[in-house]
Amino acid sequence: TTGWNEDYNAVSVTAMKRQDKAARIQAILDERFPKPPIPLDHQDPFSLLIAVLLSAQCTDVRVNQVTPALFARAPTPELMVDVPVEEIRAIIRPCGLSPQKAKAISGLSRILLDEHDGEVPNTLAELEKLPGVGHKTASVVMAQAFGVPSMPVDTHIHRCAWRWGLSNGRSVEQTERDLVRTFPKERWNDLHLQIIWFGRTTCPAMRHDPEQCTICSWAMSKARRAEEKRKRAR
């Protein structure tokens, strides 16, 4: 079959309707990542919550190296509250920001016990009340632990959405608003993972040639290519 590149290179990017562009992006991502895996290893909502919290300013690979020792020590909130914060900090030190993250892990474990019967809450509002849990972390847990449609925006999604002309890139909050308006709700969870994997493997921040990218080659406008070039030249 003819590749998307050949089909759409001649199409005016500005003339292409947002929904048409979104449909073509979905088709490419579905072909490339039909069953996108969740990058963070976990066994249940609690282990996912902790893993996502640890992933702030840290790679998923590093988190997956650290969490087995942490969960061997305390796989549940009940056991985690009995682990001294300093011990948690020592285990998670390779993930960075260990003082803040250790305090958050201990604190949220106590709240889960005291206020949620030891269970991770399945609402965005309750998750965001937990220490160390922001909107993105809560959204990831909602999507990947509970299957609730969510579009958490990380650095890869933020970058790709800007390159593809799906958002102006002013903030991750704006990017999330733009993407949930653009894609069908039932696709958000898969697309979140698909765009992350595409960003990591094909559309990286550095050493990226739009002409060789199966999406940027037709979706990225000349103006955005020029703007990215200027930023790199600084």
Report each predicted region and the residues it spans.
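Intrinsic-disorder-associated, low-complexity terminal segments enriched in Asp/Asn/His/Tyr and depleted
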Residues: 7-8
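Catalytic cores of DNA base-excision repair glycosylases
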Residues: 17-233
